[in-house]
């Protein structure tokens, strides 16, 4: 019953039809293993971000359709994934589909490095070794791995990169 109530609430708040709201709720609940009794956090998260950023709940939901499973696979939460989508949408004003696809690609590449650090990953058609990515990030003071050699959470790495973004130039 909670899921139905939250889905109806999402449809009303986001201006979505019931089918789209059901799909949006199902994607989030399944990908992030949210209990049915906790489904309200999906509506609350999307609504709070829509109020704070120049993005609608339906845009977040649409981008989440592309991104949710990849994000959950690298340990991201509903909240952090939604926040990344919101900031990217506000900053670029790209469509939800484009934001979802872009974030999914970035997250998937990180997941590939985490799963097989010795293998090459495809970056814009070029095969790149993990150590090149690691070296590039280390040159600006960011480590992909923690002190024990384990991969850090994706959102922690990205937040650290974001904090240094304005200091980067074409030579960095």
Model-derived regions: residue spans:
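Amphipathic alpha-helical interface segments used for oligomerization, scaffolding
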Residues: 1-172
């Amino acid at each position: 019953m909670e899921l139905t109530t939250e889905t109806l609430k999402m449809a009303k708040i986001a201006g979505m039809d019931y089918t789209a709201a059901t799909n949006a709720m199902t994607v989030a609940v399944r990908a992030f293993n949210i209990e049915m009794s906790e489904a309200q956090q999906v509506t609350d998260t999307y609504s709070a971000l829509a109020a704070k950023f120049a993005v609608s709940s339906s845009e977040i939901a649409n981008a989440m359709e592309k991104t949710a499973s990849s994000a959950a696979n690298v340990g991201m939460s509903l909240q952090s994934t939604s926040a990344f989508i919101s900031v990217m949408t506000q900053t670029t004003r790209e469509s939800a589909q484009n934001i979802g696809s872009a974030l999914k690609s970035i997250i998937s590449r990180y997941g590939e490095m985490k799963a097989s650090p010795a293998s090459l990953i495809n970056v814009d058609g070029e095969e790149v070794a993990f150590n090149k990515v690691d070296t590039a990030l280390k040159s600006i003071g960011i480590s992909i791995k923690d002190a024990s050699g384990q991969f850090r959470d994706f959102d922690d790495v990205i937040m650290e990169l974001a904090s240094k973004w304005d200091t980067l130039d074409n030579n960095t």
